[in-house]
Amino acid sequence: MAQEIEKEFLVKGDFKSEAFKATRITQGYLSSVPERTVRVRVKGDKGFITIKGIGNASGAARFEWEKEIPVEEVQQLLELAEPGVIDKTRYLVKNTDGKHTWEVDEFYGDNDGLTVAEVELADESEPFDKPEWLGEEVTGDPKYFNSMLMKNPYKNWK
């Protein structure tokens, strides 16, 4: 099982002109308890099941296990999922430092209007350039977890 270390930010400006790839994602949760989440996802034309552990104190690091599964199985598992589905497009944007790639998620449906960006790091103290379109850091803030957006979507925050 690998440890995932990410920093997450709100997006405040235009990033799409810098994106080199865009993929539609639909996902649901079989379990969304804080100690572990079990997610099923269709990403483009592939299916995945992912288990994530609880985050560390900063919220930047947690264990993650992911396996590709047939899209048909994801669709069947979505029938068993908790209420609510996350629908988004993930854009990939190369960072100006040449070492990192930003994953920028633009949400739809009940989370329309929310766009967040995350960068994966080798360790929490690793330096990285912050593009001009980045806003406030929200690393570790549970309300921005996809599993929480399913329960308390962005449209309800206003």
Residue ranges, per PLM feature:
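Phosphate-end processing signature that detects enzymes handling 5′-triphosphorylated RNA
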Residues: 1-158
